[in-house]
Amino acid sequence: MKLNIKYILALALILLTGCGQSQQFMAVPPDARKEDVPRQSIQLKAERFKFTPDVIRVKAGTLVRLEITSVEGTHGFQLGAFGIDERLDENQTKIIEFYASKQGEYGFRCSHFCGIGHMGMTGKVIVE
């Protein structure tokens, strides 16, 4: 019985630690909502095992507004570096905003199993 309690406590600690870390990411920090912050809107389609476009280029310091439409089936959009993971229902458009604060390449993927080609449903955001 003591062994089970130790495992439960260890698991709870791991889960709490993980939740605390994910809270450090903010898709849109309060300062990024100021009027003088550059903005860029991008339309994205999620369809049968692909995102179109699958490469998105933005400038560092930009507030990015993604308008993502799932045109075929239910998908997900996960951009882990920015703490984003959203469900995309078929024929729905979801608005996702994030602040591209730091240069680099950040992968995104479908986070909702959508069929045999699911693992290849990926893309990247390039912050220049």
What residue spans do the PLM features occupy?
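N-terminal post-signal-peptidase region of extra-cytosolic proteins
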Residues: 46-54, 79-83, 91-95, 108-109
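Extracellular/periplasmic metallocenter environments
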Residues: 19-31, 88-128
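Beta-strand cores of secreted/periplasmic/IMS beta-sandwich domains, seen most often
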Residues: 37-43, 54-73, 92-102, 126-127
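Pre-active-site segment of Zn-dependent metallo-hydrolases
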Residues: 76
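Short linear sequence elements within intrinsically disordered, low-complexity coil regions
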Residues: 12, 30, 54-56, 82, ...
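Generic structural signal for short, solvent-exposed loop/turn connectors between secondary structure elements
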Residues: 3-4, 38, 79, 83-85, ...
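Extracytoplasmic entry segments of secretory-pathway proteins
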Residues: 1-48
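Generic marker of residues within folded, mature protein domains
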Residues: 9, 34, 48, 56-58, ...
